[in-house]
Amino acid sequence: MAKLKYTVGDVSAIRRSIAEGGDVWYNKKLAGVKKNIKKHFKDKCLRCCYCQRSFKGEFDLVIDIEHILPQSLYAKCMFSPKNLSIACKRCNMKIKKASVKFIVDGYHKKRIFNKSTYKFIHPNLDAYNKHITRINIELENLSITKYVVKNNSQKGFYTYRFFRLFDFECQDFDLAQGLPIIERYI
């Protein structure tokens, strides 16, 4: 998939918004830019960059443009394509918020977009499927969802815990058979 590229109009809107100051991301001049960003990432992968839940058939309102490095702390990275993706409201607003706990201690500021700077699976620097496999099977009203960390990946384990992926793991088939639910926490 091609990298996110801004149009001349996008760059102009971004510059005007920054020049006006204030809360730049919420400037109305950026509506078209945000639409283009969201479209780019939806075309790339119609899933949350953290939990991999599908956005297929979802309205744009439930899909957030995600700033991997929070815009409140890393304003200079606000429009950097490496710092943008799409995420579900749960992962973006409920869990991650403006946290930076996922950045390794002692990282070099000039290497902020180096994958070794991040404890979790970075949406643009890492390949999710090299760290975690998400298995989801649905049959009528029953479903099974399981996240499997591959090759003892530390990024996989961190992502699993940080984004509470175990909350999504369903064992409806066990319930249907009257079997007890087994604790899934790592």
What does each model-identified segment do?
Residues 52-54, 63:
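Long, hydrophobic/aromatic-enriched structural stretches that serve as scaffold segments
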Residues 45, 62, 85:
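Residues immediately within or flanking Cys/His clusters that coordinate Zn2+
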Residues 65-70:
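Histidine-centered catalytic micro-motifs used for acid/base chemistry in nuclease
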Residues 47-49:
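Short, well-structured hydrophobic secondary-structure segments
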